[in-house]
Amino acid sequence: MKPYIICHMMSSVDGRIDCAMTAEIEKTDVYYQALDRLHFDAVLEGRVSRQIHYALPAPFKANDMVPIGEEKYHIAHPADHYEIAIDTHGTLKWPKDASNNNLLVITDEQCPQEYHGYLTANDISWIACGKKGIDLCRSMEILGEKFGVKRLGIVGGGHINGAFLQAGLLDEVSLMIGGGIDGRAGMAAVFDGIRQTDYPPRY
């Protein structure tokens, strides 16, 4: 069974979520206070957000591109809270202390098995799920059933929020609107990246 999933975000009045912009809005600490009150036992971010805030600058480059080729998972150690990264192709490298934060990385099954070996060697949990592209629905089932996650927070960026929305996985949205306006063209929105032009609105 999948966790109860809440997308928790802070945006400008016009719905933009550029980190440098939202950091300039007063009282951003209120966002993190609300995050604590939501009592998540795992928080998930997309590759770009994790690259900006947590991963090492240089990407992981596999010498052997043989894919893992099947659905698998690895629990480095059971935890009460996980920091989750979506990294479809296995490109993020992590600092040595990443395991201290109970990091969990989700890839698809085309990701090189060498990357999963790298994660295992560094005491990092992982899930490989989806023949071509991550199967979000199935990976959430694994997260709930095998890792014991009951309440999951999706905290950006806009494309991963949009992917969870499109997959019908969101149970709730928590949106804090800061007292600022972005207005710049091309900046990510709270929910972004859905290319299906006839995509119906979600209620």
Question: Model-found features: residue ranges?
Answer:
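Enzymes that bind and transform nitrogen-containing heteroaromatic metabolites
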Residues: 1-203
